[in-house]
Amino acid sequence: MTLKELHDYLLSFPNTWLDFPFGEETSVYKIGYAETSGKMFALIADKAKPLRLSLKCDPLLSERLREVYETVLPGYHLSKKHWNTILLTGQVPDDELRSLIQMSYNLAAGAKSD
């Protein structure tokens, strides 16, 4: 999945928007309203090689994904229990990435806090 495809997919979810609270090199995708800061559901380190995509994840699934894929790591500068960082090398198939993005969106949409 290219950066543009990823960006377009992340913004295709209802009530999502792009923010840069950590600077221009980190794209933060949020659900909610800008007036209330929203809830993060995805982050992309735009300048990293390979790209790094961080997503919220169920803690048990997080551990399983890390066992299956060497490019799935504990969340970079995030809760290691509730976030994974995926190095976008092609190891994780695009269909699975889309599924993980959907899960992250759903978790953030229903989350009371991070």
In which residue ranges do the predicted regions lie?
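Charge-dense, helix-prone N-terminal extensions
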Residues: 1-114
